[in-house]
């Protein structure tokens, strides 16, 4: 007996396939956006250095948990945007932001290429900052005067907040120290970062769940690369190429969003 689907069932099936295709596309765009933002970014470098110093597992979970919280916040903000602005305005504003970020990254790529900076140079700079913070912390704990001591920075405040005993009771001393430090540094460095703003923009335009899944997958991939081979690839990848790739990705997204706004 031949079973002929009714037009209604056929329409429903096609709608489901279209939804699935759209979701895969949104997730793929979110992943590529995060890779373009985070690969070689300061958060990537901090994660790689901390993993080299303390151990991979604790740093991975600390870094990724911070990124997960920041992503959740960005997605919620983006979800609220369509209720505040018309859809066309949201698309145009979001596309404009993507274009601005894209142009800025391409400009940075050109400057880095002309100055012959490498990703390894960025690792060295961030490593010095981390070492200086450790030295300052030890000096303050010993009660010694610090000539270059300034008012408490935002990172110091966050580090004190997340260094509470409840965290220390959950993990061993070494794991707790690495976990808390990775969480605090990544959390602060991601505030107002390109990836956070881009997540807000994409959440305002695309399906929130798709963006949430894609962004978290992207962050997970970048964090895994950072903790496993981050320091090793620092002298294998040219910084200007990373920035150029990110700039192109942002430019493409910006043009697509502005086009859809009209």
From Swiss-Prot:
The chain crosses the membrane at residues 31-51, 57-77, 83-103, 208-228, 242-262. It is a multi-pass membrane protein. It is found in: Endoplasmic reticulum membrane. GO terms for biological process: calcium ion transmembrane transport; Golgi calcium ion homeostasis; Golgi calcium ion transmembrane transport; Golgi calcium ion transport; manganese ion transmembrane transport; proton transmembrane transport. One of its GO terms (cellular component) is Golgi apparatus. Keywords: Endoplasmic reticulum, Membrane, Transmembrane, Transmembrane helix. InterPro entries: GDT1-like (IPR001727). Coiled coil: none annotated. This is GDT1-like protein C186.05c. It comes from Schizosaccharomyces pombe (strain 972 / ATCC 24843) (Fission yeast). The lineage of its organism: Eukaryota, Fungi, Dikarya, Ascomycota, Taphrinomycotina.
């Amino acid at each position: 007996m031949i079973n002929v689907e009714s037009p209604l069932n056929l329409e429903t099936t096609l709608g489901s396939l279209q939804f699935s295709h759209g979701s895969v596309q949104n997730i793929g765009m979110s992943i590529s956006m995060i890779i373009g933002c985070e690969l070689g970014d300061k958060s990537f470098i901090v994660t790689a250095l901390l993993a080299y110093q303390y151990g991979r597992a604790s740093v991975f979970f600390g870094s990724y948990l911070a990124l997960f919280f920041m992503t959740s916040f960005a997605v919620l903000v983006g979800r609220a945007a369509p209720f505040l602005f018309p859809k066309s305005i949201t698309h145009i504003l979001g596309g404009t932001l993507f274009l601005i970020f894209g142009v800025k990254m391409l400009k940075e790529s050109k400057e880095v290429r002309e100055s012959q900076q490498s990703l390894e140079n960025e690792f060295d700079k961030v490593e010095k900052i981390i070492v200086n913070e450790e030295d300052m912390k030890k000096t303050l704990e010993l009660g010694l005067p610090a000539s270059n001591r300034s008012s408490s920075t935002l990172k110091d405040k966050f580090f004190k907040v997340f260094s509470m005993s409840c965290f220390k009771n959950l993990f061993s001393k070494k794991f707790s120290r690495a976990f808390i430090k990775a969480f605090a540094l990544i959390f602060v460095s991601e505030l107002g970062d390109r990836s956070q703003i881009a997540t807000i923009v994409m959440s305002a335009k695309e399906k929130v769940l798709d963006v949430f899944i894609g962004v978290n997958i992207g962050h997970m991939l970048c964090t895994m690369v950072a903790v496993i081979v981050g320091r090793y690839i620092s002298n294998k990848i040219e910084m200007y190429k990373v920035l150029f790739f990110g700039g192109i990705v942002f430019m493409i997204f910006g043009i697509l969003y502005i086009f859809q706004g009209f």
